[in-house]
């Protein structure tokens, strides 16, 4: 199991489009992935769950990934956050 903290750095936070990219990315992996912040923990493969986090810019998200492809999944998720969901120029 891997755990890591990621910071939402894109201007609009985890809005619908960013959430869809996150869920689509994590759905490619077999590992179970949870995201937590502000006392809420959700399945990263659930668009409604991720939207419920209401994560704005600057929010720290704790990521927990468990499964055979956890390292690859964590790298993909980290890159998505680092690239600001390919939204900010």
From Swiss-Prot:
General (non sugar-specific) component of the phosphoenolpyruvate-dependent sugar phosphotransferase system (sugar PTS). This major carbohydrate active-transport system catalyzes the phosphorylation of incoming sugar substrates concomitantly with their translocation across the cell membrane. The phosphoryl group from phosphoenolpyruvate (PEP) is transferred to the phosphoryl carrier protein HPr by enzyme I. Phospho-HPr then transfers it to the PTS EIIA domain. This is Phosphocarrier protein HPr. Phosphorylation on Ser-46 inhibits the phosphoryl transfer from enzyme I to HPr. Pfam families: PTS-HPr (PF00381). InterPro entries: HPr, HPr-like, HPr-like_sf, PTS_HPr_His_P_site, PTS_HPr_Ser_P_site. GO terms for biological process: phosphoenolpyruvate-dependent sugar phosphotransferase system. The modification Phosphoserine is found at residue 46. It is found in: Cytoplasm. The keyword Phosphoprotein applies. One of its GO terms (cellular component) is cytoplasm. Keywords: Cytoplasm, Phosphoprotein, Phosphotransferase system, Sugar transport, Transport. It comes from the Bacteria. NCBIfam families: PTS_HPr_family. Residues 1-88 form the HPr domain. Belongs to the HPr family. The gene is ptsH. The active site is at residue 15.
